[in-house]
Swiss-Prot record:
Domain of life where this protein originates: Bacteria
InterPro entries: IreB
Family: Belongs to the UPF0297 family.
Taxonomic classification: Bacteria, Bacillati, Bacillota, Bacilli, Lactobacillales
Protein name: UPF0297 protein LVIS_1222
Listed Pfam families: IreB
Length: 90
């Protein structure tokens, strides 16, 4: 079987979710501190990729840009489904 026939495996690594979680907590707190609606601002960033949705306070903008947006969305979906008992914890 040639390498072109093999299925590629997509994995962010076992330690990535904790990093994404910590980043989201920091970003959320920075947005609250600035008086913004954290959920709306984070969603705006995730949809557009525009870092202007995230303030520079507490280095929040640089922290969130260290993660790909699809990694952040994957973590949000994983945590949501795990907390609601919809899937096995991974």
């Amino acid at each position: 079987m040639s390498s072109l026939d093999k299925t590629m495996y997509f994995d962010f690594g076992a330690n990535q979710p904790k990093d994404v979680h910590d980043t989201l907590v920091t970003v959320y707190q920075a947005l609250e501190e600035k008086g913004y609606n954290p959920i709306n601002q984070i969603v705006g960033y995730l949809l557009s990729g525009d870092p202007a949705y995230i303030p520079r306070i507490d280095d929040a903008r640089n922290l969130i840009r260290k993660h790909e947006r699809d990694e952040i969305i994957e973590e949000l979906v994983r945590v949501y489904l795990n907390q609601n008992g919809s899937v096995k914890k991974s």
